[in-house]
Amino acid sequence: MSQQYTLPVTLPPALSQEPLKPVSPPADTQQEQVKQATPLPAPCQKMLSELPVEVPLEDAEKHTTLVKGVPEQECEPQPQEPQQQELHVEQQQQQQESQVQELHVDQQQQQQESQEQELHVDQQQQQQESQEQELHVDQQQQQESQVQELHVGHHQQQQESQEQELHVDHHQQQQESQEQELHVDQQQQQQESQEQELHVDQQQQQQESQEQELHVDHHQQQQESQVQELHVDHQQQQQESQEQELHVDQHQQQQESQEQELHVDQQQQELQVQEVQQQQQQQQEQQEDHQKAEHLEQEEAQREQQLKGQLEQEKKGVYQHLDQELTKRDEHLEKKGEHCWSSRRSL
C-alpha cells in the first residue's frame, strides 16, 4: 500500500530550542511603523506637511535639513539605540520564525504531494485490477460459450454416429473433441475435418451399399441367365449389335476429331500465312520508307550544292563589282591628283 516519505530538515540550535510564535509582518513594514511612530519636532512636521504627497518619507527627511531658520539638530530624531536593538532582535526572531514556518509549510506540501501521488498510483492500480478482472470475466464467458458450443457439437456428432452405427468414427470423434477442449483456436478446423470425414464415410458406405446391390443384381442376373439359357443367343446378338453400334460411334467420333484437327491445322496454316504476309508488308513498307529517306537526303544534298553554287556565283559577282568600283575610284582619284598637280604647276 501507500508509504509516506518525510524529508529531514536541520534547524539552527537557536531555533530548535525556541517555541514557534505567530507570524508577524515583515521587517520592512515594521521599520515603516517605527518610523511613523517616532515623533518629529514641530518645524519638521510643518515642512513635511508642505511637501508634495508623492515624495517618499526618506526624501522628506532629507528636505527637512534645508529649511531656512531651522537648525539641523531640531530636525534630526532623538537617538533610540536600545529600542532599535530590541527591534532588530525581534526582526531576527520573526525572520527565523517565518523561515521555520516556511519549512513547515514546504514539508506539509511535500507530504500532500506524496500522498496525492500515492493516491494516484492506488487509483491506477485499482483501475488496472478492475480491467484485469473484466478481461478475466470476459475470457471465462468466452470459454464457457466455447465449451457449450463444443458440448452441443459433440452431442450432435454422437447422435449422428449412433444413427449411422459408425462406432469407430465415434470413438475418434470423442478423442478429437477431448483434444479440441485443450485447443479452442483449432475447434473450427477440426470440426470441418470431422464433417469431411463423416461425409467421406457416408460416401464410402453408399458406394459399398451400391456395390453390394450391384453384386446382388449381378448374382440374380447370373441365376436368371442360368435359368434362361434359352435366351442366350438373343443376348449375344444384342451384345454384338451394341458392340457394332459402339464401334460405329467410335469411328464417327474419330472422324469428327480428325476433321476438327484438320480444321484447326488449316486455321493455324492460314494464320501463319497471314503472319508471313504481314511480315512481308512490313518489310516492304520499311524498304519504301528507307528509299524515301534516301531520296529525300539526296534531294537535300542537291539543294545544298545548288545553293552553295548560287552563293559562290553571287559572291564572285559582288567581288567583281567591288573591284570595278575600286578601280574606278582609283582612276578618278588619280585624275584629280593629276589635275591638281597641273594647276599647281601653272600657278
From Swiss-Prot:
PROSITE patterns: INVOLUCRIN (PS00795). It holds the Pfam family Involucrin2. Substrate of transglutaminase. Specific glutamines or lysines are cross-linked to keratins, desmoplakin and to inter involucrin molecules. Residues 27-36 have a biased composition (Polar residues). Keywords: Cytoplasm, Keratinization, Repeat. Belongs to the involucrin family. Part of the insoluble cornified cell envelope (CE) of stratified squamous epithelia. This is Involucrin. It comes from Sus scrofa. The lineage of its organism: Eukaryota, Metazoa, Chordata, Craniata, Vertebrata.
